């Protein structure tokens, strides 16, 4: 069975955006292509168990096994060597992407303390949106008593839209709660 947001996109969001922006073809309507989640851990080179825990927790959150990211260069000031594992990342596409977005918008973000909406200034000018969360414990899959370290997660929402306005409308139609929404 297809993800709930995928069917919502096909049945509701595409006609709505097509009407709003007056595209010539239905293929010009912006769509979400992938979501990339990245965790960078500074203490990963001194505490490898923290990185393993982050990999396991990111796998729980996304339903997909993350890949460890390695240092490209040695930096003596930070005591890291080339090839050391410093974080992990996962790229979500298809049903995994829509399921994660559904859980993020409807379950995780409302659990953030004093949440007023996400910032709408995270667009890069090409229709991609970047945001981060400060703690991984907002996801219900993470058991608070089992975690050792808190870390943030950077998220990039990659769309095929040409402008920030189109991407903002797309993500808002998916239910992303923006702070300064009109």
Swiss-Prot record:
Its protein name is Large ribosomal subunit protein uL5
Transmembrane residue ranges? none
What are the BP-aspect GO terms?
A: translation
**This protein's GO CC annotations:** ribonucleoprotein complex; ribosome
Q: Does the keyword Ribosomal protein apply?
A: yes
Record's keyword terms, sorted: Ribonucleoprotein, Ribosomal protein, RNA-binding, rRNA-binding, tRNA-binding
Query: What functional role does this protein have?
Result: This is one of the proteins that bind and probably mediate the attachment of the 5S RNA into the large ribosomal subunit, where it forms part of the central protuberance. In the 70S ribosome it contacts protein S13 of the 30S subunit (bridge B1b), connecting the 2 subunits; this bridge is implicated in subunit movement. Contacts the P site tRNA; the 5S rRNA and some of its associated proteins might help stabilize positioning of ribosome-bound tRNAs.
Q: Which organism is it from?
A: Leptospira borgpetersenii serovar Hardjo-bovis (strain JB197)
Give the molecular function GO annotations.
Answer: rRNA binding; structural constituent of ribosome; tRNA binding
Tell me how this protein assembles.
Part of the 50S ribosomal subunit; part of the 5S rRNA/L5/L18/L25 subcomplex. Contacts the 5S rRNA and the P site tRNA. Forms a bridge to the 30S subunit in the 70S ribosome.
């Amino acid at each position: 069975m297809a993800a709930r947001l995928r069917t919502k996109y096909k049945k509701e969001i595409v006609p709505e955006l097509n009407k709003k922006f007056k595209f010539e073809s239905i293929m010009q309507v912006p769509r979400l292509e992938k979501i990339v989640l990245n965790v960078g851990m500074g203490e990963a080179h001194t505490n490898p168990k923290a990185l393993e825990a982050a990999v396991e927790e990111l796998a729980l959150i996304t339903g997909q096994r993350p890949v460890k990211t390695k240092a490209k260069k040695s930096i003596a000031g930070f005591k890291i060597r080339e090839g050391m594992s410093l974080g992990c990342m996962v790229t979500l596409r298809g049903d995994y992407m829509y399921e994660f977005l559904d859980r993020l918008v409807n379950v995780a973000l409302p659990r953030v303390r004093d949440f007023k909406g996400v910032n709408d200034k995270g667009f890069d000018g090409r229709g991609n949106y970047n945001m981060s969360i400060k703690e991984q414990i907002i996801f219900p899959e993470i058991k608070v008593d089992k975690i050792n370290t808190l870390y943030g997660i950077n998220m990039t929402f990659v769309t095929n839209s040409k402008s920030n306005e189109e991407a903002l409308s797309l993500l808002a139609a998916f239910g992303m709660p923006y702070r300064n929404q009109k």
